[in-house]
UniProtKB/Swiss-Prot annotation:
GO biological process, one term: heterocyst development
Physiological role: Putative heterocyst to vegetative cell connection.
Keywords for this protein: Heterocyst, Metal-binding, Zinc, Zinc-finger
Gene encoding the protein: fraH
Name of the protein: Protein FraH
């Protein structure tokens, strides 16, 4: 395994660059002692602790020394054989030349690196230094170990009381269907005309057309409607109950011939008589159907 020097990512043996950051990885070699894979610039083997520098110097010497190989230079031009025969010493008959032949050129010395074991090692013997003077050290008083502290007894956890199961009673479907079918109506006593209250509204405004609050129940078409204010009364739907309140009319609102003061409200029941204004001239009966 080769560890990247840039990001410390472990790479497989033989990898050239890091798989994570693509940084070139250092070259590796084998430990001469145990054969483990080590980096070429490592000082010690990570497996057996062998000193790799002890064998790195001879190996470098063998690698750098190379024998000098003579280079033969071919002649620039081939001599003419006829001219060689005309020379006086062409046949080599010169006695002086035969008596003193030219010495052959010496071969370059071949450098042979000596094996590591054959290299003599000169060990310098140095005299042992004198033993150091004994230093008197005062004996320190041993500190008594702390007394063991008994761990506190675990307090048994109090199991919480099981919460009572909440049973949510589903509302009966027939009652829901009955509420959906019940609608509130106002029956005009003077004309016997029925007005259905909008079931989608939680507040039904009763009055006549105006610029402030448009009425949901417009009484301007009934007789004697001049005694009804433009913003006269409201009927509120809260759950399954209907409430009526006077919102500041000029001639007042009466429930069952009793005045309904502004700010108060009355829960309507089937058959209640609602009079808008004095004199019982614009009257409605509350009905549920």
């Amino acid at each position: 395994m080769i560890v990247c020097p840039n990001c410390n990512h472990p790479n497989p043996d033989g990898a050239v660059q890091c798989e994570a950051c693509y940084t070139p990885l250092p070259a590796t070699s084998n430990c001469p002692n145990c054969g483990a894979t080590v980096q070429s610039d490592a000082a010690f083997c990570g497996q057996c602790g062998f000193n790799l520098h002890s064998v790195a110097a001879p190996a470098a010497t063998v690698a750098t020394i190379a024998p000098d190989v003579p280079v033969e230079v071919p002649p620039l031009a081939n001599p003419d054989p006829l001219l060689e025969l005309l020379q006086p010493n062409a046949l080599g008959l010169d006695p002086v030349a035969n008596e003193n032949p030219p010495a052959p050129a010496p071969l370059p010395p071949t450098a042979v690196a000596a094996p590591p074991d054959a290299t003599p090692v000169v060990v310098e013997v140095t005299p042992a230094p004198p033993p150091p003077e004994p230093v008197v050290v005062e004996a320190s008083i041993p500190t008594p170990p702390p007394e063991p502290v008994a761990p506190p007894e675990p307090v048994p956890a109090v199991e919480p009381a099981p919460a009572p199961e909440t049973v949510v009673a589903a509302p009966p479907s027939p009652a829901r269907t009955q509420l959906q079918q019940i609608t509130a109506r106002l029956v005009h006593v003077q004309s016997d005309q029925e007005i259905e209250l909008p079931p989608s509204l939680s507040v039904v405004h009763i009055g006549k057309p105006n610029d402030r609050i448009p009425p949901d129940v417009d009484v301007s078409g009934f007789a004697n409607s001049e005694i009804v204010s433009r913003v006269h009364a409201d009927i509120r739907l809260e759950g399954d109950a209907h409430y009526i309140e006077d919102v500041g009319s000029s001639n007042g609102t009466y429930i069952n011939n009793l005045p309904l003061l502004p700010g108060n409200r009355h829960r309507l029941r089937p058959g209640d008589r609602i009079s808008l204004g004095k004199g019982d001239l614009v009257t409605f009966l509350f009905k549920l159907a």
